[in-house]
């Protein structure tokens, strides 16, 4: 039986984590949204109770932050708040440590310096608000947890800004990108 469980295993971060654990020959159980619907509380509790992992990497998320404002607003909240709450409750019920992957969108972006771990949050969009609600659920439910706030995630697998720019540079003489965003790429 594996001591590690990964949600969101088919997303960019989950895929990277699975490959890293494979390279290190560390056993794990990994589930994408088709194998584990985190918005289904009963399914999550049953899966965790059956497997009893010691550590849960909660990588599952709704990440289309532009669509989270309107057409997918409800789905954003179902996955990022309700789903995270379900994972947190199931983790706590088996005494597992939870690692929650959050985002820099929990901040308003007005800080000119780096954000410190205890910096005040002030999300400006629905995605950031839902991810912050997920953080609050983890903090209030799970005894042993880590919250990791990432930005500009990229890696070998999945769609990401770095690979998009490399691909476009091969086919375009001139690229235009926004110049008002500041972030720290996360590999």
List each model region and its residues:
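N-terminal Rossmann NAD(P)H-binding glycine-rich loop of SDR-like oxidoreductase domains
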Residues: 2-23
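NAD(P)H-binding glycine-rich loop region in Rossmannoid oxidoreductase-like domains
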Residues: 41-79
């Amino acid at each position: 039986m594996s001591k590690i469980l990964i949600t969101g295993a088919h997303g960019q971060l989950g895929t990277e984590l699975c490959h890293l654990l494979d390279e290190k020959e560390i056993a794990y159980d990994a589930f994408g949204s088709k194998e584990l619907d985190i918005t289904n509380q009963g399914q999550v509790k049953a899966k965790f109770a059956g497997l009893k992992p010691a550590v849960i990497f909660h990588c599952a998320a709704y990440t289309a932050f532009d669509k989270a404002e309107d057409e997918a607003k409800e789905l954003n909240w179902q996955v990022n708040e309700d789903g995270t709450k379900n994972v947190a409750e199931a983790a706590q019920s088996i005494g597992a440590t939870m690692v929650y992957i959050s985002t820099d969108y929990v901040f308003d972006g007005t800080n000119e310096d780096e954000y410190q771990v205890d910096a005040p949050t002030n999300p400006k969009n629905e995605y950031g608000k839902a991810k912050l609600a997920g953080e609050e659920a983890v903090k209030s439910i799970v005894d042993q947890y880590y919250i990791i706030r990432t930005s500009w995630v990229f890696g070998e697998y999945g769609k990401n800004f770095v690979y998009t720019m490399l691909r476009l540079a091969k086919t375009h003489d001139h690229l235009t990108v926004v110049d008002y965003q500041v972030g720290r790429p996360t590999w």
